[in-house]
């Protein structure tokens, strides 16, 4: 995009932005502490941001992520609490890339519509929408129930008998159960994963520690972590699936993606995916969270 001008981004977490509980309870539930809602981000709020000089609003925590709150009555898969950090969970442990987090909806059954209305309000106030894109990892119990018809889920056709295959979406520690150093519960409450999948922070064994991202699973972009070999032809399944996710949200009116932990995903994917998205949405902007300065200009 040319002549974009100066961008001023305001990060806004709907869950926290409009919360009204004056005395929140430490480690409290949503029933105790409440949660802000997308509908509460009204034109008054948005106009005030615009008047401050803000050009883009980065809405954090929109995409459905692991949580200890039970929404199974709405057809949402319940997360095992032992692979959720905190009651609210992390907005970077995605459980369904094609859905909206129910905590921030007034009417859970209309959560996507409420997001679409938020996008419309934001645009009507002269602002752009930034959404998180988390390409490196997903929640351990990732399962998309809201994916469009014909879309194949991550890991759906993986060969779990192989540690690495370019056709797999995950890495599997074959013959080993997931055995982190943190408590995984007992009996019916126990979290069981076999074979163990590699953990999000490049932990390629079955025993991540409490400081690892043990609640997440690393995505496989066609790189064998043991020897660094790259298998990008034909295009890996993960590339196509993640690009489809970008296109889905761009079609919802998202103007920019704040891309999480960019350096943990092959540069080649970014060149390919950005070009694919811009074929249909040439004005979409990609913003990188990047900690490897060696690939800054890649």
Each language-model region and where it sits:
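N-terminal structural segment of carbohydrate-active enzymes
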Residues: 1-128, 136-137, 143-147, 157-159
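Conserved structured core elements
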Residues: 6, 91, 109-116, 236-243, ...
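Active-site beta-loop-alpha junctions enriched in small/polar residues
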Residues: 15, 62, 134-138, 262-264, ...
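Short glycine/proline-rich turn/loop motifs
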Residues: 17-30, 94-102, 205-234, 238-239, ...
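Short, acidic/polar
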Residues: 33-49, 231-251
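Aromatic- and acidic-residue-enriched segments that line the glycan-binding/catalytic groove
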Residues: 65-94, 135-211
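Active-site-proximal helices and loops of the catalytic beta/alpha 8
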Residues: 119, 152, 160, 165-180, ...
